Amino acid sequence: MLQPKRTKYRKPHNVSYEGKAKGNSYVAFGEYGIMATNGAWIDARQIESARIAISKQLGKTGKMWIRIFPHMSKTKKPLEVRMGSGKGNPEFWVAVVKEGTVMFEVANIPEAQMKEALTRAGHKLGVTWKIVARQGAQ
C-alpha cells in the first residue's frame, strides 16, 4: 500500500477537503480519467483496490496513472480508552481529495474497456465521481 517514506511530523492537523481543487483538475497524461465530484479523504487501501480493479482491465498495452497519493496520517485512539491524554497514534494514511480532482487516468485501450475499468475503480473509492475525457481527445 502507498505511504510516504518519511514525514516531517507524525501527526498532522486535519486538512479540510471542502472546496474546489486548485490543481490536478484535468486529464493530463491519459485519455480518460476519474474526477471527484465532492471532497473526501481517500484511504491508501481504497487507492490500492482501485488500482487493482483498473489493472485487471488494462491488459499489456494499457497504461494507468495514479494522480493522488496518501500523504496525511490519520490517528486513532485505542478501543475503550477514555478521552483526553493526547492525540492517538497514526493508524492509516489518506489522500485529501477535493471536488474536481482527477484521481486516476488510463490510456491505450478501447473506449468501452476504458470506461468499464474506470467504473469498477470508481466503485472502490469513497467519493462520488464522474468519468472525464482529455480536452480534444474526441
From Swiss-Prot:
UniProt-recorded name of the protein: Large ribosomal subunit protein uL16
Function field: Binds 23S rRNA and is also seen to make contacts with the A and possibly P site tRNAs.
One CC-aspect GO term: cytosolic large ribosomal subunit
Keywords: Ribonucleoprotein, Ribosomal protein, RNA-binding, rRNA-binding, tRNA-binding
Similarity annotation: Belongs to the universal ribosomal protein uL16 family.
GO molecular function ontology, one term from the record: rRNA binding
PROSITE patterns linked: RIBOSOMAL_L16_1, RIBOSOMAL_L16_2
Gene3D superfamilies the record matches: Ribosomal protein L10e/L16
Record carries keyword Nucleus: no
Subunit details: Part of the 50S ribosomal subunit.
GO biological process assignments: translation
Upper taxonomic lineage: Bacteria, Bacillati, Mycoplasmatota, Mycoplasmoidales, Mycoplasmoidaceae
